[in-house]
Regions:
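Conserved lysine of the Walker
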Residues: 46
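N-terminal pre-Walker A segment at the start of P-loop NTPase domains
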Residues: 2-26
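Electropositive, glycine-dotted interaction segments
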Residues: 97-234
Length: 234
């Protein structure tokens, strides 16, 4: 985290975004900066890159499965180009100066169920620093089991009953037993996406409301005036 001004204290800069097998993105690793502008022709993957970041944010709210279902299910969102082999596997991840996170989603291996096409979380990993290394791992999940690293470097089982549609980021995070997961979860939940901000006459941003100091504009832009004034003052 960079803290050169009061506004910077609420920012957490991502350095890298990685996506594999999502829509038009077969395998992509993108370096990021404080302001990153993505350009390209229609169909080049700009929207897919943005959606992948939103899916990562949904992981912190246990909303990724529903989000993928709204897109037509995992089979509809997978890379469908030439050269696809092996099991269905959608991989997403990001890294910053303090934390990194990666998740692998696939299809369930279960018997009779009405939800047989729901994606399930196969593996997850959380690490400190910008690079995923065994020594940097602070938490990892495989199937229904998640473990976290204690202060002395030893591993401790945090859960053996994670449901396939629940992320360890949302389920295992704890201020005492898994503080790194808690910090990561809260920062992921603080991400904002403004692609659906309304501008019509009845838009939330056009309605009267009491303004308070607002360091981050809300998803719907309802606190636009307060956020603008906060920026002017800090």
């Amino acid at each position: 985290m960079r803290t050169s001004s009061p506004v910077d204290k609420v920012l957490w800069v991502l350095d890298t975004l990685a996506v594999a097998n999502y829509r038009s993105l077969r395998r992509l690793v993108v370096p990021l900066r404080r302001c990153t502008v993505v350009t390209g022709l229609n169909g080049s993957g700009k929207s897919s890159l943005y959606r992948s970041l939103r899916l990562l944010a949904d992981m912190a709210r246990n909303g990724a499965v529903n989000a993928l279902a709204r897109e037509g299910g995992l089979a509809s969102t997978m890379w469908a180009g030439p050269g696809r082999r092996g099991p269905v596997s959608l991989k997403l991840g990001f890294a910053g100066e303090e934390f990194g996170y990666a998740v692998d989603l696939g299809l369930p291996q279960v018997g009779k169920t009405a939800f047989g096409l729901d994606p399930e979380i196969k593996t997850e990993a959380v690490w400190t620093g910008p690079w995923l290394r065994p020594a940097a791992l602070t938490a990892e999940r495989s199937g229904s089991m998640a473990r976290v690293r204690d202060d002395d470097g030893s591993w401790r089982i945090a859960s053996t009953a994670l449901r396939p549609y629940d992320s360890m980021v949302s389920e295992v995070a704890d201020p005492r037993d898994a503080p790194e997961l808690l910090a990561l979860r809260e920062r992921m939940r603080s991400w904002r996406f403004y692609d659906h901000v309304r501008t019509d006459g009845a838009a939330p941003a056009r309605q009267a409301r009491i303004g308070t100091r607002t360091m981050v504009l809300n998803h719907d832009g309802a606190d636009l005036a307060a956020a603008w004034q906060t920026i002017a003052e800090v």
